[in-house]
Every structure is written in C-alpha cells, then in structure tokens.
Amino acid sequence: MNLITTIIAITITLSAVLATISFWLPQMTPDAEKLSPYECGFDPLGSARLPFSLRFFLIAILFLLFDLEIALLLPLPWGDQLTTPALTLAWSAAVLALLTLGLIYEWTQGGLEWAE
C-alpha cells in the first residue's frame, strides 16, 4: 500500500474511533457547583457569564479566515518556479474565488454591518 493511502486510512480510522467514543461517553449532569464560577475559593464579585457580542465574534472569524488566506498565498511566488506554474495559479485563483464568494455572501447577509 502507498504511504499516503496508509496515512489517510489511519487518519480516517482514528477520527471515526474518537467520534464514536465521544458519542458513547455519558454526559455528566451539571449541578449548581459545576455551573458556579470558581475564583480561588472566594465568592465571585460579579457575574462570570458576561454577555458577548455575536457581531464581534463574526468579525473576528472573518479576520482569521482572511489572515489564513494571506498565509496560503504567501508562497505563491515560489510556486511559479515549479514545473506546472499554471496549476499553482489555478489553485490560488480557486482559493481567492472561494473566499471572495464567502465575503460577498457575508456582506449580503449583513454580517459586516456593525450597528443596525
């Protein structure tokens, strides 16, 4: 068997086993002690469950995606020196097109508007 095929088979098998085990493990029932915040033995001064802006979270996720895009496209000049630079450029264009379509979708859904 090919080395890549073996690695892919091991990865898929390990993922399936771990996913199956996680579904079979019992869920622990939360009680008041587990749900209360712990602050080094002292009573909490305020609420530990602060409200979090979902808009901020979405903007942060978009930032991470486009930061990853830059990391993926940085080695592009070295990819031009390969035997098939057209294939490298095609993959880069596909990544850019996919991210652009995602950005357009997020924009049309109103995810980039901070205040309503």
UniProtKB/Swiss-Prot annotation:
Its main location: mitochondrion. It is a multi-pass membrane protein. Pfam families: Oxidored_q4. The keyword Translocase applies. It is an enzyme of class 7 (translocase). It catalyses: a ubiquinone + NADH + 5 H(+)(in) = a ubiquinol + NAD(+) + 4 H(+)(out). It is found in: Mitochondrion membrane. Its EC number is 7.1.1.2. GO terms for molecular function: NADH dehydrogenase (ubiquinone) activity. Keywords: Electron transport, Membrane, Mitochondrion, NAD, Respiratory chain, Translocase, Transmembrane, Transmembrane helix, Transport, Ubiquinone. The chain crosses the membrane at residues 3-23, 56-76, 85-105. It comes from the Eukaryota. Coiled coil: none annotated. One of its GO terms (cellular component) is mitochondrial membrane. Belongs to the complex I subunit 3 family. Core subunit of the mitochondrial membrane respiratory chain NADH dehydrogenase (Complex I) that is believed to belong to the minimal assembly required for catalysis. Complex I functions in the transfer of electrons from NADH to the respiratory chain. The immediate electron acceptor for the enzyme is believed to be ubiquinone. This is NADH-ubiquinone oxidoreductase chain 3. It comes from Salmo salar (Atlantic salmon). The lineage of its organism: Eukaryota, Metazoa, Chordata, Craniata, Vertebrata. The gene is MT-ND3.
